[in-house]
């Protein structure tokens, strides 16, 4: 049998190759592979010793063990201590009550998609899990199991073919994301029950619903996603009253003018991935005020539809359009608000001149080439300019010089950057973001570091010497393309005098200690896991600390971060335990928990005693919890602006 030996593991870390063909692993090899700082795919393994499981649990990324068809209780206990945020055990066809109890302690996303049935004891155990739980192998739920799993606090995903009224009533008590993507039918009573669910609700498999069922679901208070092929005027009128942050209605084959008029009255973001719609429907939708996305299915528009949509006031997204006539470009240039035409792959000089007159944020994300003349035209645009697709070809030095004259936020996606282009872009006045496909030369880094203001460099590698150059930059610096940091880079950038932002998803103790020496704002918003040691190190950082990528925070981690002197942002947390709320309430700076959606009465009472300013997201918490938190003397409710929901945890 093919076995991962110590030698094979060492070679894998050195040069990386496909190790999915191996069915066994030595304990010593597991210790080595645990150090791998990327998702670890070991789906070929058919068996795993307890010692190997304990070793692999130290891995801080995704761990894929979907080749395992069974799991001993001790191995389950070991894997539950996995330090990464995703554990995939899709091959398991059965699970003992003790193994379920053990895995429930795992705080990250847990995939148990191979389970086709679940007894009530196992369901009760898994209900105590606090991350995202995928049980897509279950095609049906008994009423008892549904009642047990409804107590789960976090995302739930089932591939249920049917749902009884009683089971729907039980699941409605669940708090968090509830995703039922293959459910094809839903009774009016079941819809009435699910409308009471607190959290995001995705029903992507339902192609038809009665008007009564739609009316019930429209009363749902969270984000709602439906995939209806037809929508009556009455149903549209009901959905227009939906008060959640986002409403998605996809797959409607022929949206009538009346239905469009009704939907346009909705106050809030509206996502309508439509394949086609009439000119009259376009005219009606244009009256919607706010975020309007017509998705990627709309690949062409009539002149009348363009004229109508151009009058829309608010954010407009049409990323299915791959080309536009000159008249269409001129019309969209008059649009008032953010405009995303991310499907366009090319742009003539004439079209660039027209779009440059648009006032507001302009995104042409899929543009793969840009002439110097077109760049010169776009540089006259007043507002944020996003050109992220220029990674297929090199941006000429002339085009870089032209774009550098743009006044406002400039976001470019490039394959590389010459020293001359870097020198030109360094003169840009305004926030500058560069997504670099490959690494930069020292000369280019030294040149771009002279940019005055906010600088974002999204590239995947940086050595100590490059970090020394960047440390001389004056202004906030974002390096969100770096998924890992060496101790040398961390120590070099710790000398940086402005705000720092990194895209790392995990940190070693030593790197955390290095970053903690930085004096200024520190953002680690993609950090998905936090050990107690790292939390203790970061707590010593002097300046505001942002950890918005953390979806789960242990009580010990919360206790450590509570000692941080400065503002603390944990906007990714949807759930907070009573103990976690109690220790965070002792934090002496401002505390931001805008994503918090699940909190007990006791936890709310604890947070209400927090002395600094407390930021919470509007519409996230129940009315009862809001009343308890109202006792906080410096409570600030924030209108949460998030990207459109994908409903894929």
What are these regions (language model features)?
Residues 1-41, 263, 285, 403, ...:
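N-terminal segments that cap or nucleate solenoid repeat domains
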Residues 14-25, 36-48, 59-71, 83-95, ...:
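Concave beta-strand-loop units of leucine-rich repeat
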Residues 34, 53-57, 76-82, 100-104, ...:
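A structural signal for leucine-rich repeat
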